[in-house]
Curated annotation (Swiss-Prot):
<keyword id="KW-0862">Zinc</keyword>
<feature type="binding site">
    <location>
        <position position="206"/>
    </location>
    <ligand>
        <name>Zn(2+)</name>
    </ligand>
</feature>
<keyword id="KW-0244">Early protein</keyword>
<protein>
    <recommendedName>
        <fullName>Transcription factor TFIIS homolog</fullName>
    </recommendedName>
</protein>
<feature type="domain" description="TFIIS central">
    <location>
        <begin position="77"/>
        <end position="201"/>
    </location>
</feature>
<feature type="binding site">
    <location>
        <position position="237"/>
    </location>
    <ligand>
        <name>Zn(2+)</name>
    </ligand>
</feature>
<dbReference type="GO" id="GO:0008270">
    <property type="term" value="F:zinc ion binding"/>
</dbReference>
<keyword id="KW-0804">Transcription</keyword>
<dbReference type="InterPro" id="IPR001222">
    <property type="entry name" value="Znf_TFIIS"/>
</dbReference>
<feature type="binding site">
    <location>
        <position position="234"/>
    </location>
    <ligand>
        <name>Zn(2+)</name>
    </ligand>
</feature>
<dbReference type="Pfam" id="PF01096">
    <property type="entry name" value="Zn_ribbon_TFIIS"/>
</dbReference>
<dbReference type="InterPro" id="IPR035100">
    <property type="entry name" value="TF_IIS-typ"/>
</dbReference>
<feature type="binding site">
    <location>
        <position position="209"/>
    </location>
    <ligand>
        <name>Zn(2+)</name>
    </ligand>
</feature>
<keyword id="KW-0479">Metal-binding</keyword>
<comment type="similarity">
    <text>Belongs to the TFS-II family.</text>
</comment>
<feature type="zinc finger region" description="TFIIS-type">
    <location>
        <begin position="202"/>
        <end position="242"/>
    </location>
</feature>
<comment type="function">
    <text>Putative initiation factor. Necessary for efficient transcription elongation past template-encoded arresting sites.</text>
</comment>
Amino acid sequence: MKMHIARDSIVFLLNKHLQNTILTNKIEQECFLQADTPKKYLQYIKPFLINCMTKNITTDLVMKDSKRLEPYIILEMRDIIQMMFFRTLQKHMFFKEHTDLCTEYAQKIEASCYHYTYQQQEKTFLEEYSTRCGTINHIINCEKKSHQQQDNDALNKLISGELKPEAIGSMTFAELCPSAALKEKTEITLRSQQKVAEKTSQLYKCPNCKQRMCTYREVQTRALDEPSTIFCTCKKCGHEFIG
């Protein structure tokens, strides 16, 4: 009985995307006849489901290992991700006024993330795909925190046409946000070059032994326009704390 339930579900998922009942039944039947266990049946059908999602399915597709992909979840997830991108883009006035373009870009951005992830395969597909989509969604969000609003390079290029939505999924952070990447690189370089010489002071009280015999050093751990972080070490008990 479990095998029949699984087969019905597979037929439904395949036909949902193929929109061709004859081809769907033929593919599913071939996989079923070649499999002698439910596990092998699922192994055989997976490549067809995966290619179905990318709309590249053919009757002569070679069956091979799908590298731990989770096709059943992804089939339903892609529509949800596309809607997420659509809502994020629509926060910008330009896309509110161009709904058709917003829909097109949302679909192409999601497809770009999908194909990029499909080529990676170092992690499980679902984990990599979700992470990639979340990163891209943050980058194109025009409602970032105030100190991040000037870093909307990718969104501005998307609107101007300089950046193609179908290419965004495979681009690096430096390619998508050159201004933010340069700023981050500058901060890292500055932190690595700064002097961290320790000084002795009685200004800081050790929370462990309550003594005021401490060495301290200042390190720029946050943005350049924010105060340095002071790391203290008690000379009496060796306890380390932030001043």
